[in-house]
Design a protein with these regions (language model features):
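Pore- and pathway-forming membrane helices of multi-pass small-molecule/ion transporters and channels
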Residues: 2-13, 22-65, 72-79, 96-142, ...
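Hydrophobic multi-pass inner-membrane translocation pores used for secretion
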Residues: 447-448, 492
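C-terminal functional regions that serve as terminal interaction/effector modules
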Residues: 471, 484-485, 491-512, 671, ...
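Hydrophobic alpha-helical transmembrane segments
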Residues: 18-25, 41-48, 88-98, 342-349, ...
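Membrane-interfacial segments
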Residues: 42, 88, 92, 113, ...
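Cytosolic regulatory and coupling regions of membrane transport/channel systems
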Residues: 1-29, 141-411, 415, 419-422, ...
Length: 702
């Protein structure tokens, strides 16, 4: 019985592996071509570039939104990598110094808390090229090999993008529309629940007074209820309204796009701004639905009709009955003109957000814009580094730790080479670099995986050498090894395959097999010792410290956001691009903090059963409580900030106002009621910002 039950699981795994193999075939074919072409013309010293560029191509193909200019800027770093590796290989102790500065700067500038391992292939490429150092006369050859790799990789990437886009497997615009559809569907469902909640409240009054009318035919079951006791429970309906569910859709989109955003030096492209702005509008609608649901007795039959009609519009787009954005915009415009609230505050709130949504829907030019301004992106990245390049920041501490440990491993390599003439000691810093992760527990787990994968890899390599002729050893091992790595079966499998490729580079037909295998094992052990000896004493990175820096980052974003809103109150409009950018990073920071808090839950459950950890468990509970408070306060602040931004949308201004050289004379179409509503929103923002600023920081661990 047990064996039979396991058959579907094994079958599913086999199917999954087959799909991974199918997806990996183009990469494998290109890798074999690139690696062996460079190997044939330039030798094994530069053929290692093929490995790096193939992994790079896999990442970039899966991020189709990156513009060519940003892609070219990214490729420029590979030229820097090749030059630094060449410079470091000219002299032994120069190698140690260059390694420290290169890895520190690459880690600091090419990764952050959201993409902590983004520097990996630039660092690994640098170290792999040091396996075979070149002399000064050979530098042009290496640069030529690098440029050839760049040209071939670019051709491959854009060919794959074209094929995947044509087959529908990869379409960034379709992916964006799917997120918008998901958010619209969520809003539609919540509007229906809100209308039903209003119908229940009206029915309660009407049952008491002897009336049974409802505003919408969909709620006749409420009118047909025999008595008030048979009506749906309002509290149950209120629980169905979940505004944070819409917020999480925007968070999910923000996290999905962050790889591309980072490679754009941290700026959103027009397409990303367009989609994220639509999701922000949905967030605002969800927040207003939630606010309205708190007082269901104030929902009139006319309000119910408003909500049901609006729900139909969003449902039509979500289900595909409305397929064009222009059609959605026209339908929404008709709705705004024909529907309204009697209550002034409700009218200004809902109309302000729906008008912002309408203006965004019509800005279709922005939805196709994949570019980011070069100068602005450089300025933004400098500002980001100025804010975060300090010893309190987790990634800065990790950059120092990584650079120090790998440089120490490089020094051990130099000393062993000089003292005992150990060949290929470069694998010590390579292994140290491979197993290091941001947090110590991740590093220890990676060390264990490396140890197991290395032992298995050594055993398999001994078999390969025994059965495969030496002339076929490199083509077979390199090809199969790369296939296993690119299929991403499991960490240990990837390390085993990597060991095969490493041993192939180390192994010489003239050397004894036992000597090669022993050298590989010894190098891994030495590298692991270098890492373990340092990670617990130098620049430790803890999740509690990361949470503290994220609190500070959220406060900084909030202050900058309210500065933009104050500017908007003074001049009648905000800088829409800047505010959307700030709201994007607010979503990223809060999502990152939620992920760290989930890890704290796991840690707490693990330590609660240990009597000696009671103090640590208490610290974790206090930390979680503080994080929850910060996230709750920041969510409320974000909702009011978004509302103010939409009310101060610069697109509300008349075209003639936009060309006026004196901004203080601009005339906006705002009514007195809307101005009062904006002032009230600003007061709420100031109050919530004060709560965030006066809240005590997270307590430090004892």
């Amino acid at each position: 019985m047990q064996t039979t039950a396991n058959i579907p699981t094994h079958k599913n795994k086999a199917v999954e592996l087959w799909h991974k193999f199918i997806e990996a075939r183009p990469y494998l074919v290109f890798f074999v071509g690139l690696f062996f072409v460079i190997y044939h013309f330039f030798g094994v010293a530069d053929a290692l570039l093929g490995i790096i560029f193939l992994f790079f191509s896999r990442t970039i193909i899966e991020e189709p939104g990156l513009s060519f200019m940003n892609y070219a800027r990214r490729l420029g770093w590979f030229i820097v990598m090749a030059l630094c590796a060449t410079l470091a290989g000219l002299q032994e102790f120069l190698f140690v110094g260059v390694t420290f500065f290169y890895l520190f700067l690459i880690t600091l500038t090419q990764s952050d808390d959201y993409l902590p391992r983004n520097f990996y292939w630039l660092g690994m490429g640098y170290l792999l090229l040091l396996i075979y150092p070149v002399s000064i006369p050979e530098i042009p050859t290496r640069l030529l090999a690098t440029l050839l790799s760049i040209a071939c990789t670019t051709l491959f990437i854009y060919s794959m993008r074209a094929i995947l886009t044509k087959t529908g497997k990869l379409n960034v615009f379709a992916r964006d529309r799917e997120y918008v559809r998901k958010a619209f569907e969520d809003i539609s469902k919540q509007l229906v629940v809100l209308a039903e909640l209003g119908a229940v409240s009206v029915a309660e009054v009407q049952k008491t007074e002897g009336f049974t009318e409802v505003a919408d035919a969909r709620f006749t079951h409420i009118a047909d209820a025999d008595c008030v006791a048979d009506l749906p429970d309002p509290s149950v309906l209120q629980r169905k309204i979940r505004p944070k569910q819409t917020y999480r859709i925007a968070q999910e989109y923000a996290q999905l796009e962050y790889g591309t955003v980072f490679r754009q030096r941290g700026l959103l492209s027009g397409r990303q701004c367009y989609t994220f702005a639509l999701l922000l509008c949905c967030e605002q609608l969800a927040d207003m639905i939630h606010a309205t649901s708190k007082d269901p007795h104030a929902i009139t039959p006319e309000d119910q009709q408003y909500f049901t009609d609006l729900a139909d519009i969003f449902a039509d787009y979500a289900t595909g009955r409305i397929t064009k954005v222009s059609q959605m915009a026209a339908t929404l415009e008709t709705f705004i003109e024909s529907h309204s609230f009697a209550d002034t505050c409700h009218r200004e709130s809902w109309n302000g957000v729906l008008e912002a949504l309408l203006r965004t829907l019509r800005d279709t030019r922005l939805s196709r814009d994949e570019s980011t301004p070069f100068i602005k992106s450089v300025k933004y990245r400098i500002m980001f580094l100025r804010d975060n390049a300090n010893l309190q920041n987790t990634q800065t501490r990790f950059a120092l730790q990584l650079a120090t440990i790998v440089s120490l491993a490089a020094l051990v390599d130099v000393l062993l080479t000089r003292l005992v003439d150990m060949p290929y000691g470069i694998w010590i810093p390579i292994v140290a670099f491979t197993i290091l992760n941001t947090y110590n527990d991740e590093t220890l787990k990676s060390t264990a995986n490396n140890a197991i994968g290395t032992l298995v890899g050594i055993a398999l390599f001994a078999l390969f050498v025994h059965f495969i002729p030496s002339s076929f050893l490199m083509p077979v091992v390199i090809t199969v090894g790369y296939l296993i790595i690119v299929m991403n079966i499991a960490p240990i499998a990837s390390i085993t395959a990597g060991t095969q490729m490493a041993l192939t580079a180390l192994y010489s037909a003239d050397a004894a097999l036992s000597t090669t295998l022993f050298a590989r094992l010894a190098l891994v052990i030495i590298a692991a010792m270098c890492v373990v000896m340092v990670i617990f004493v130098f620049m430790q990175t803890q999740r509690s410290a990361t949470l503290r820096t994220k609190i500070s980052e959220l406060e900084r974003i909030d202050r900058r956001l309210i500065t933009q809103i104050h500017f908007g109150l003074k001049h009648g409009q905000v800088n829409l691009w800047r505010t959307v950018q700030l709201l994007y990073y607010m979503h990223m920071s809060s999502g990152f903090m939620e992920d760290l808090a989930e890890h704290l839950d796991t840690k707490e459950a693990k330590w609660e059963s240990r009597p000696g950890r009671s103090k640590s468990v208490e610290q974790i509970k206090r930390l979680k409580h503080d994080v929850d408070r910060v996230l709750a306060l920041n969510y409320k602040f974000a909702m009011d900030a978004e509302h103010a931004v939409m009310l101060l949308d610069p697109r509300r201004l008349h075209d003639d106002s936009l060309s006026d050289p004196h901004p203080e004379t601009w005339v906006t179409p705002d009514s007195t009621a809307r101005i009062k509503h904006i002032d009230a929103t600003n007061e709420r923002l100031e109050e919530k910002l004060h709560k965030l600023e006066t809240m005590q920081h997270i307590e430090k661990d004892d």
